A protein has these predicted regions:
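Short beta-strand elements
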Residues: 149-158, 168-172, 273, 286, ...
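Active-site-adjacent loop and "lid" segments of alpha/beta metabolic enzymes
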Residues: 246-296
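A structural-propensity feature for long, helix-poor, extended segments
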Residues: 155-179, 305, 313, 321, ...
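Conserved small/polar residues in nucleotide/adenosyl-binding loops
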Residues: 326-332
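Short, glycine-rich nucleotide/cofactor-binding loops
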Residues: 16-27, 171-184, 214, 309-314
Length: 336
């Protein structure tokens, strides 16, 4: 059984109720049909019955719950709660109603906030900012969270690196140019996400164009400082930097460029220095190595809400639903 098949088996065993708010996108219905066929989750699709019927033509989504915000008896409760949560920001009943009726991501997040759903997956036709803004406004962050960030779970076929091709890449979707403290926080969160997803111990590489002082630049200094901060805060975590990509994952190169490192040559968590590098990096691996890329999945929000790439396929949505809502309940035994 492959890694993602194991994840799907976990999803079936502990089904969550997931909101899919993007009823205007055909991929939502293609994914929903597959999720329901595989019995991976209970689904809520937000939209009018007419819109859902038209959008899902030729697909079986009959087991999904269709919630029409205009007709749902709980809509007023969501309006009232949104006013309560955002009153200090000037939210009025009229504005709250307009917001949740015109933006189904807001509506879906309110369903999660009120306990009517376990989580939400969105972003196939909305930007990351538009997807995560309501989450940060309404759900807030987990206690103790230093920074909300995003990661991709990468599953690379026929790959000898990482844990048989399984990696976490962070941050590839949210923080543009993190400072050393933020980069350290991304590393900490990504390591914990890897541990929860796979049951394996993370080996974290702080990536750079330099390995152990081979280049001098302010960008390198940032990664060096982030590595120091993360190590001091997490002395038991296998984490090292700064490392070039080949030194991080190729054993022979790691032994040559960083012979004293416990991470070099065997990293399974790759932390990119900025969003440009991370976004380009995951897409290169996805497109050229034919990797499965699940995400960007958020770290640090108080409830499981996850973004999608606007270039995602229906199968990508299926994978994100399966992965996102099993990692919180995975046992500690290894899955890879």
């Amino acid at each position: 059984m492959g890694f993602i098949d194991t994840i799907k088996a976990r999803a079936k065993a502990d089904k969550k109720t997931i909101v899919l708010p993007e009823s205007e996108d055909r991929r939502t219905y293609e994914a929903a049909a597959q999720i329901l066929k595989e019995d991976l989750a209970n689904l809520i699709i937000i939209g009018s019955e007419e819109a859902v019927k038209k959008g899902s033509e030729g697909l079986d989504v009959s087991k999904a719950t269709i919630v029409d915000p205009e007709k749902n008896e709980k809509t007023q409760a969501y309006v009232d709660k949104l006013v309560e949560l955002r009153a200090k920001k000037g939210m009025t009943p009229e504005k709250a109603r307009e917001t949740i009726l015109n933006d189904y991501t807001y509506y879906g997040v309110m369903m999660v906030k009120m306990g009517d759903a376990d989580g939400l997956v969105s972003g196939a036709c909305h930007s990351t900012a538009n997807t995560l803004r309501p989450c940060l406004q309404i759900l807030k962050t987990k206690p103790g969270t230093k920074l909300v960030s995003a990661f991709f779970l990468m599953v690379v076929p026929d790959c000898e690196y990482g844990d048989d091709g399984v990696f976490v890449f962070g941050d590839c979707g949210l923080n543009q140019n993190p400072n050393p403290e933020e980069l350290a926080a991304i590393a900490e969160s990504s390591a914990e996400s890897y541990r929860m997803l796979t049951g394996n111990e993370p080996r974290v590489a702080m990536l750079s164009h330099s390995s152990k002082g081979s280049a001098k630049h302010a960008d390198v200094d940032k990664v060096v400082e982030a590595t120091r901060i993360a190590k001091e805060a997490n002395p038991d975590l296998a984490l090292d930097g700064e490392l070039q990509l080949d030194a991080a994952i190729v054993p022979s190169v790691g032994a040559s460029k960083a012979p004293d490192s416990k991470v070099a040559g065997k990293a399974n968590v790759l932390i990119f220095p900025d969003l440009d590098a991370g976004n380009i990096g995951y897409k290169l691996v996805q497109r050229l190595a034919k990797a499965e890329a699940y995400g960007p999945m958020t770290q640090g929000i108080a409830a499981p809400v996850n973004d999608l790439s606007r270039g995602c396929s229906a199968e990508d949505i299926v994978g994100v639903v399966a992965v996102s809502y099993t990692h919180l309940t995975l046992p500690t035994n290894s899955l890879v």
